[in-house]
């Protein structure tokens, strides 16, 4: 209305009508639109369904922080950080070097306060942030900086789940085996796994599903042996539990982190990047070092 007002008086009249609440920023609700439940409530239900304990979640969360703190000390992230404007940023301050299983165990459940297992400590914190990646063909990549880490996008897969039957954040557990089966690969053929850690429970439930033959056969419709899942190859430089979850930018953050790690590995090394999303969606990509 102000832009269409004619004359200074008309503009001033419009500005005087602005109330304080009109300037208040809307805080996005982390809720599933189709159910009204928060993602944490959905993760609680899935953790109960798969029998993932509070202790398992806290152990995983502490490991995510340890990995991120080590990677920060080794300056792994330095090439991935861009300072905003006049404020220099050369390290991520979110990973905690004092995080322990004992400290995490003292935190109270956040979504089911009586019987829940998901706490602020084993959930990813929502953060302010942005991330970007370049996608180029063989010719276009020569226009990028020579020291930029580059990987090859080999294939990708998307999946969706029945939220009530399988759990809101479980679609990657369908997409991953389908992608691997199509490429005639097993779990051991993947040298690096970058899995979005929305919640420690969600990662652990996904891994359990990937190790469950009935899930693979009946839900993913994959009737082949993929082998034991290599948990030690998951998020070696920390994940969203330690680094945070900038809504809308996490996928690019994980892709850039995967590319930076793959760039240090031999040519032909493979990485699976996995991200769960609202609506029961899952997005998975297969990358390869060049």
Where are the model-predicted features located?
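Cysteine-centered functional microenvironments
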Residues: 46-53, 58-60, 114-126, 189-199, ...
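N-terminal extracellular/periplasmic Venus flytrap/periplasmic-binding protein-like
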Residues: 19, 56-143, 215-216, 220-233
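Active-site-proximal alpha-helical scaffold in enzymes
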Residues: 47-76, 132-140, 207, 246-267, ...
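Condensing-enzyme catalytic core mediating Claisen C-C bond formation in acyl metabolism
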Residues: 14-28, 102-174, 178, 182-183, ...
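Active-site pocket-lining segment
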Residues: 162-242
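Short, well-ordered beta-strand elements within core beta-sheets of diverse protein domains
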Residues: 43-53, 133, 177-185
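Flexible glycine-/small-residue-enriched beta->alpha junction loops
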Residues: 1-45
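Conserved beta-ketoacyl condensing-enzyme motif
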Residues: 1-3, 75, 80-91, 188-210
């Amino acid at each position: 209305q102000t832009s269409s007002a004619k004359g200074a008086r008309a503009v001033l009249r419009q500005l005087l009508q602005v109330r304080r609440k009109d300037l208040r920023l809307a805080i996005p609700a982390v809720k599933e639109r189709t159910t009204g439940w928060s993602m944490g409530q959905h993760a609680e239900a899935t953790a109960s369904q798969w029998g993932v304990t509070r202790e398992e979640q806290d152990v995983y969360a502490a490991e995510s922080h340890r990995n991120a703190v080590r990677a920060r000390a080794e300056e792994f992230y330095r090439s991935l950080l861009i300072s905003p404007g006049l404020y220099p940023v050369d390290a991520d301050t979110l990973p905690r070097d004092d995080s322990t299983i004992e400290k995490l165990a003292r935190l109270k459940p956040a979504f089911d306060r009586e019987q829940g297992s998901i706490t602020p400590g084993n959930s990813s914190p929502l953060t302010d942030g942005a991330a970007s990646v370049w996608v180029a063909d063989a010719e276009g990549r020569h226009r990028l900086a020579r020291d930029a880490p580059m990987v090859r996008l080999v294939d990708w897969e998307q999946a969706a789940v029945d939220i009530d039957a399988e759990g809101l954040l479980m679609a990657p557990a369908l997409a991953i085996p389908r992608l691997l089966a199509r490429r005639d690969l097993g779990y051991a053929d993947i040298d690096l796994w970058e899995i979005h850690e929305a919640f420690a429970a969600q990662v652990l439930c996904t891994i359990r599903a990937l190790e469950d033959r009935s899930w693979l056969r009946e839900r993913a419709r994959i009737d082949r042996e993929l082998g034991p899942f290599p948990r030690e190859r998951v998020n070696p430089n920390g994940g969203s539990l330690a680094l945070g979850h900038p809504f809308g930018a996490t996928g690019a953050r994980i892709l850039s982190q995967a590319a930076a790690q793959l760039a240090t590995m031999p040519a032909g090394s493979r990485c699976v990047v996995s991200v769960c999303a609202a609506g029961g969606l899952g997005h998975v990509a297969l990358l390869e070092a060049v």
